[in-house]
C-alpha cells in the first residue's frame, strides 16, 4: 500500500471516529443529571459563593434540591426559547430557568412560558420561593437569592443567582403551593 493511501485511510478513520463521538457528547451534555445534594449554610437564607448558591439548612428538602439542581444551570448561556420544550437543553431563557427550578422543587411537570407562570401556583409571595412573572419575563426569589437571566452588565445574561434584587413593578407574585 502506498504511503498516501495509508495516510488517507488513517485520516478518514480518525475523522469518522471523531464524528461518532459528537452525538454521544451532546446527549450526555443535554441529559446530564443535576445534583440532588450540595452545600448548605445555617439558617433560613441561602448564600452565594463564587456563583454557587448554598441552600439554607432550615429549608424544606424540595427547596434545597431545587437550589442544588439550579446551580447546574449557572454557566449555561441565555437562549431565547431555551427550556420550553425540555427541562434539559444547552441554554435557557427566563421561563426555562424558572421552570427548571420549579421542576426540581417537585412543583412542575412541564416547562411553562412566562405568561403562563402569571397564573402558576398560589397568589402572592411564598415562604421559600416566589415567582415574579409577566408576559415577556419571569424571575424568582429563592430563600433570599434572585434567580434571573438578565444581568447588569456585559456577559451576565443567562441563568444566574444574584444577590441584588430588582423591581417587581408590573410583575405578578406567585408561589409554589406549600413553599
Predicted regions and their residues:
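Short linear capping/connector segments at secondary-structure termini
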Residues: 48-52, 81-86, 115-120
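Residues at secondary-structure transition points
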Residues: 16, 87-88, 112
Amino acid at each position: 500500500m502506498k504511503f498516501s493511501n495509508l495516510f488517507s485511510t488513517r485520516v478518514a478513520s480518525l475523522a469518522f471516529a471523531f464524528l461518532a463521538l459528537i452525538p454521544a457528547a451532546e446527549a450526555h451534555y443535554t441529559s446530564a443529571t443535576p445534583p440532588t445534594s450540595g452545600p448548605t449554610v445555617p439558617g433560613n437564607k441561602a448564600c452565594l459563593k463564587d456563583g454557587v448558591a448554598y441552600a439554607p439548612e432550615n429549608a424544606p428538602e424540595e427547596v434545597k434540591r431545587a437550589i442544588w439542581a439550579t446551580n447546574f444551570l449557572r454557566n449555561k448561556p441565555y437562549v431565547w426559547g431555551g427550556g420550553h420544550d425540555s427541562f434539559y437543553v444547552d441554554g435557557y431563557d427566563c421561563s426555562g430557568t424558572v421552570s427548571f427550578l420549579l421542576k426540581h422543587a417537585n412543583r412542575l411537570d412541564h416547562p411553562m412560558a412566562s405568561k403562563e407562570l402569571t397564573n402558576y401556583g398560589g397568589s402572592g409571595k411564598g415562604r421559600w420561593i416566589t415567582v415574579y412573572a409577566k408576559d415577556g419575563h419571569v424571575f424568582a426569589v429563592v430563600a433570599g437569592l434572585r434567580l434571573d437571566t438578565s444581568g447588569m452588565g456585559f456577559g451576565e445574561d443567562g441563568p444566574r443567582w444574584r444577590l441584588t434584587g430588582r423591581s417587581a413593578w408590573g410583575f405578578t407574585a406567585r408561589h409554589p403551593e406549600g413553599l
